[in-house]
Curated annotation (Swiss-Prot):
PANTHER family: 60S RIBOSOMAL PROTEIN L12, LARGE RIBOSOMAL SUBUNIT PROTEIN UL11M. Keywords: Methylation, Ribonucleoprotein, Ribosomal protein, RNA-binding, rRNA-binding. The keyword Cell membrane does not apply. It comes from Phytoplasma australiense. This is Large ribosomal subunit protein uL11.
Length: 141
């Protein structure tokens, strides 16, 4: 018989840098999870993605055990890295802060495809292009 899930915790943690300090400690402490165990497992799983923020969904069971699923980094982080900028535009409609190529957009869409609500790379490209537009990033052909 399957274990009963008592709590789902969603966090965004820098890859390879989970520690018991906030926000990880308080969120998992409330769920009565072994925090050092989670931190070591998360850091081991995400050590190859250093420099990105990784969304994670933690399922906590009745017996205080847990499992977690990592997602792909947020599209905005991937776009900022591709455009080599620190932040998006404060006024995206009038001020463009950077440009990226269609090939860079497709790379990001391929990476994000499994987490997006899209069945094809073309649909994923449109979703990522919308995020880029809202950040003030121009896409050139």
């Amino acid at each position: 018989m399957a274990k009963k899930v008592v709590k789902m915790v969603k966090l965004q943690i820098p890859a390879g840098k989970a520690n018991p300090a906030p926000p990880v400690g308080p969120a998992l402490g409330q769920a009565q999870v072994n925090i050092p165990s989670f931190c070591s497992q998360f850091n081991e799983t995400t050590k190859d993605q250093m420099g990105f923020i990784i969304p994670v969904i933690i399922s906590v069971y009745e017996d205080r055990t847990f499992t977690f699923v990592t997602k792909t980094p947020p599209a905005s982080d991937l776009l900022k890295k591709a455009a080599k900028i620190d932040a998006g535009s404060a006024n995206a409609k009038q001020t463009k802060v950077a440009t990226i190529s269609k090939s860079q957009l497709q790379e990001i869409a391929n990476l994000k495809l499994r987490d997006l609500n899209a069945y094809s790379v073309e649909q994923a490209c449109k979703i990522i292009a919308g995020t880029a537009r809202n950040m003030g990033i121009l896409i050139e052909d």
